[in-house]
Each structure stands twice: as structure tokens, then as C-alpha cells.
Amino acid sequence: MVMLDTLANALATIQNAEMRAKSEALIWPASKLIINVLRVMQREGYIGEFEYIDDGRWGKIKVQLLGRINKTGVIKPRFPVKLRDLERMPHWLRKYLPAYNIGILILSTPHGVLSHKEAIAKKTGGVLLAYVY
């Protein structure tokens, strides 16, 4: 099986496990980007603890689920967003989140992978990666 987008595969695995009311999900292959996205989701309270399992090949990540994710996915194409756009929430950005104060957008910024709330607090823009609510 060829995996073209490992981040999309990881988020789909998490969402499928949440819909089946599982307590944990196993994500493979692991990558630094996936781990950083999971850290943001953990800081925002969408997932519990996660651990990296080195299997000698690609590695796996075991994620504890809390049952708080309704929908998650990647944003394709990954386009850049300025700070001004994040603060105003234009109409094209609203299609990823159901309401103004519900959910998070995950961005790759010069300060690392952050949620859109953290990016606004640090006054930086970035490239949109994913959404979670």
C-alpha cells in the first residue's frame, strides 16, 4: 500500500477510531510532523497521552482518545495564511470550522506547529495543515 499523505492517513485513523468509540488508536508510519500535530491536539484537549513505538522500520504512535473529536482532516492544498487573515476569519477559512469559537486550525509556522489561537497570540502566520473540532 502506497501512502501519499501520512498526515491525512493519521488523522483519518484517529477519526475512525473515535467514531468506533475506541479508547486508543495506532498510527503508522510515524513522522515528526504527525508528532507535532498530535502535541497541538493534546495541548488543546482533543486527545490524551501518546507514545512513539520504535519498531525498527517506520515507527508507530499509540494515541489515547478522549472522545472529544467530531471531525478532523487535512487542508489541501496547503496554502499560506497571514496573521491578518487569522484574526478576521474570512469566509474561505470558515468552511473548515463549524463556528467562530469551535475547533482549531493547525498551522506550520516559523515558531513550529501551532493552533490558530497560539499563532494569533504569537503574532505569526503560517501554512494551514489541518483542522479539528
Swiss-Prot record:
Keywords: Ribonucleoprotein, Ribosomal protein, RNA-binding, rRNA-binding. GO terms for molecular function: rRNA binding; structural constituent of ribosome. It comes from the Archaea. GO terms for cellular component: ribonucleoprotein complex; ribosome. One of its GO terms (biological process) is translation. Pfam families: Ribosomal_S8. The keyword Ligase does not apply. Belongs to the universal ribosomal protein uS8 family. NCBIfam families: PRK04034.1. Part of the 30S ribosomal subunit. This is Small ribosomal subunit protein uS8.
